[in-house]
């Protein structure tokens, strides 16, 4: 009886792999701006063929995580197969916040994400080499990073998502190493004012970016996300804002990322 259950479990596992046969690869991408290799996880669909061009979804991880975090539960790979796109997850460092840091010249993660990584993917994979075929999203620090890079590089990205993102960092001057990247808020207030998402909406041309924001109602970033939503409404910037019961955790994000992929792929 035990052996039969074991064989059944193995068969079910094989069926799962057969149904979702995406390919996952870890690559080193050289950053001239930072003079180092950056680890990047690339997932291609089972149907990947160099004769076809594929849209790309870039996914940025949160504080203290790395390029592998989004792959741990298999959801992203299944979405890649479902929508026939590529997913790219760069290592954003322990706490880069995806800035080109004004106080730490060796931290140039904006340049890496919005320039060097794009160039690498477009030259090494069969991608849609146009902003309309690129989306970027992320969770927490990565949600901030996605919005930050997309707003500042609307010529590069056509769609942006934000999952529980730190879209206003000013209420959190002592948290998550932000002051290491911008300097303290007391000594460098301008760095904090101009590098927080809620103060960057004037850079948006209405309709220039497809924007999808998602944050749980029990999240400590919920209030700042609601404030950004209200400001975008006031400035008549089209966007989708989703608010559901949930917290700042992977249970929420693993569900929310499915809707982000649907949002992006409807617009590719």
Q: Can you annotate each of these PLM segments?
A:
Residues 12-20:
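Hydrophobic h-region of N-terminal signal peptides that target proteins for export
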């Amino acid at each position: 009886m035990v052996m039969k259950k074991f064989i059944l479990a193995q068969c079910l596992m094989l069926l799962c792999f057969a149904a979702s046969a995406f390919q996952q690869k870890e690559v080193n991408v050289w950053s001239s701006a930072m003079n180092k290799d950056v680890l990047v996880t690339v997932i291609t669909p089972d149907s990947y063929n160099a004769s076809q061009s594929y849209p790309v979804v870039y996914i940025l991880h949160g504080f203290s995580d790395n390029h592998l975090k989004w792959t741990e539960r298999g959801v992203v790979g299944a979405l890649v197969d479902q929508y026939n796109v590529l997913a790219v997850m760069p290592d954003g460092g322990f706490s880069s916040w995806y800035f080109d840091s004004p106080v730490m010249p060796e931290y140039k993660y904006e340049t890496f994400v919005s320039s060097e990584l794009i160039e690498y993917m477009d030259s090494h994979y069969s991608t849609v080499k146009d902003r309309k075929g690129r989306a970027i999203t992320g969770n927490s620090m990565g949600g901030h990073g996605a919005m930050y890079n997309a707003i500042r590089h609307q010529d590069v990205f056509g769609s942006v998502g934000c999952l529980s993102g730190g879209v206003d960092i000013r209420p959190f001057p002592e948290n998550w190493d932000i002051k290491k990247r911008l300097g303290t808020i007391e000594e460098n207030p301008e760095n904090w004012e101009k590098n927080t998402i809620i103060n960057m909406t004037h850079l948006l041309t209405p309709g220039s970016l497809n924007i999808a924001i998602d944050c749980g109602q029990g999240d400590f970033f919920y209030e700042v996300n609601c404030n950004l939503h209200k400001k975008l409404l006031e400035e008549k910037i089209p966007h989708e804002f989703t608010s559901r019961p949930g917290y700042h955790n992977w249970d929420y994000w693993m569900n929310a990322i499915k809707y982000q992929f649907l949002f992006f792929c409807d617009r590719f």
